[in-house]
A protein has these predicted regions:
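Selective transmembrane helix interface/packing segments
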Residues: 1-268
Length: 268
């Protein structure tokens, strides 16, 4: 289409990879489980069952209620697994290794596919377009949940608290509509900013090597700073990133469940 670029970017490639890993892993584990004569979870399936129960009991059930828990748990599970895998793959230096191989062995041209792959970050959830797409799913899930629970028209009526004078409707309605848009915007910014911040911090710390190299005009000083300061700090932040991966996936999933639950349980 004229004016629209549909080329496959690095983040699109990573999204396909993440989707394939999540779908393939869950499908393989489920089929292996169902092929047993006595379906008893063991090994990897124990972890899958624990994750399903944890999301269902700690996130879905308290927010959407027992009536809708089966309907909405799959969405929350998909969000959590997708975000965890996307965040985790971003920590693996796949394209950095490709860059080193290219530098040492391949020596590809400036406009080659390899050069295009090694430019930019590899964490799909650090791209605001990706997190905006996830938040858009949450936005429509809220509308669908409220419409299924109360009817389409009543769902929109529920935006205004009951018992409020109609005289202040012109003030409340725009505020509530803005609130509907702020929720997915907040989800978008929170996830992308948190996943971007850690990588920026690591790059900033590793840049000390080059800064001290230029400052003292000595490669030995740069390497020394890297060994004594930059590398240990970068490793520490990378370890912290592992925690952030789980926390951000949990927070995004929890907030989605809270927003969906608010549309269903209006009295809350």
């Amino acid at each position: 289409i004229a004016g629209i670029n549909f080329s496959v970017t690095k983040h699109v490639l990573m999204l396909w990879l993440v989707a394939g890993i999540v779908f393939g892993t869950v499908t393989w584990a489920t089929r292996r489980y169902l092929k047993q004569e006595r379906p008893v979870p063991h090994g990897f399936m124990n972890a899958v069952e624990w994750l399903v129960q944890a999301i269902r009991d700690s996130i879905a059930l308290p927010n959407v209620g027992s009536k809708y828990v089966k309907a909405w748990t799959p969405l929350f599970l998909t969000f959590f697994c997708f975000i965890v895998v996307a965040n985790g793959i971003g920590l693996i230096p796949i394209f950095e290794v490709i860059g080193l191989v290219d530098y040492a062995l391949l020596h590809s041209g400036e406009h080659s596919l390899v050069k295009r792959l090694i430019h930019g970050g590899a964490t799909a959830t650090a791209n605001y377009n990706v997190t905006a797409a996830l938040a858009t799913i949450t936005f429509f899930a809220i509308i669908i949940a409220g419409s299924k629970a109360h009817g389409f028209v009543q769902h929109w009526k529920n935006l205004v608290p009951s018992g409020v004078s109609k005289a202040i409707y012109p003030i409340l309605i725009p505020i509530e509509l803005m609130g509907m848009l702020v929720r997915p915007f907040a989800l978008t910014m929170r996830l992308a900013a948190n996943m971007t911040g850690g990588h920026i911090a690591i790059l900033a710390i590793l840049s000390f090597v080059f800064l001290f190299n230029d400052l003292f005009n000595s490669a030995a000083v740069g390497v020394g700073v890297g060994m004594m300061l930059s590398v240990p700090l970068a490793v520490g932040i990378s370890a912290l990133e592992i925690v952030i991966i789980l926390v951000q996936a949990y927070v995004f999933t929890l907030l989605t469940a809270v927003f969906v639950g608010m549309a269903i349980n209006v009295h809350h």
